[in-house]
């Protein structure tokens, strides 16, 4: 598994974090100190990278949390099977995989794209 542990205080907006066994990108991060005898708490709001679900989490800032290592890769569209599915070839390994095309993205065969990959899940990024 491509993930590591970090303290919650080391996170910031735009980072990735594991929430409910899904890789999520942090949209909002805030900390609050509850009082004289309490540790600071962090509130994290994030959106799933591959499923789009919104999730939130509240943890002490010194707690450890899993952070996924999401790879950003370059690929080339080999062919379009339909308007929503395409064959993509990784430009480093020359491996060919089938991916969903986001609805508002208009791509053609032989175009170069950028995509995210984590534990067998892949998503084409919008330009």
UniProtKB/Swiss-Prot annotation:
Post-translational modification Hypusine, affected residues: 36
Compartments where located: Cytoplasm
PROSITE patterns noted in UniProt: IF5A_HYPUSINE
Record lineage: Archaea, Methanobacteriati, Methanobacteriota, Stenosarchaea group, Halobacteria
Gene3D superfamilies: 2.30.30.30, Nucleic acid-binding proteins (2.40.50.140)
Keywords: Cytoplasm, Hypusine, Initiation factor, Protein biosynthesis
GO cellular component, one term: cytoplasm
NCBIfam families in the cross-refs: eIF_5A (TIGR00037), PRK03999.1 (NF003076)
GO biological process: positive regulation of translational elongation; positive regulation of translational termination; translational elongation
A GO term, aspect molecular function: ribosome binding
InterPro entries: IF5A-like, IF5A-like_N, NA-bd_OB-fold, Rib_uL2_dom2, Trans_elong_IF5A_hypusine_site, Transl_elong_IF5A_arc, Transl_elong_IF5A_C, Translation_prot_SH3-like_sf
PANTHER family hit by this protein: TRANSLATION INITIATION FACTOR 5A FAMILY MEMBER
Superkingdom of the organism of origin: Archaea
Record bears the keyword Nucleotide-binding: no
Name the UniProt record assigns to this protein: Translation initiation factor 5A
Keyword Cytoplasm: yes
Function: Functions by promoting the formation of the first peptide bond.
UniProt family annotation: Belongs to the eIF-5A family.
Organism this protein belongs to: Halobacterium salinarum (strain ATCC 700922 / JCM 11081 / NRC-1) (Halobacterium halobium)
């Amino acid at each position: 598994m491509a993930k590591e542990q970090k303290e919650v205080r080391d996170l910031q907006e735009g980072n990735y974090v594991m929430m409910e066994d899904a890789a999520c990108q942090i949209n909002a991060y805030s900390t609050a100190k509850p009082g004289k005898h309490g540790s600071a708490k962090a509130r994290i709001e994030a959106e799933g990278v591959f499923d789009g679900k919104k999730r939130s989490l509240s943890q002490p800032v010194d707690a450890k949390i899993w952070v996924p290592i999401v790879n950003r890769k370059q690929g080339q569209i080999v062919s379009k099977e339909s308007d929503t599915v395409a064959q993509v070839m990784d430009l480093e390994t020359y491996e060919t995989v089938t991916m969903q095309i986001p609805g508002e993205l208009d791509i053609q065969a032989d175009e170069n794209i950028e995509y995210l990959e984590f534990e067998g899940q892949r998503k084409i990024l919008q330009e």
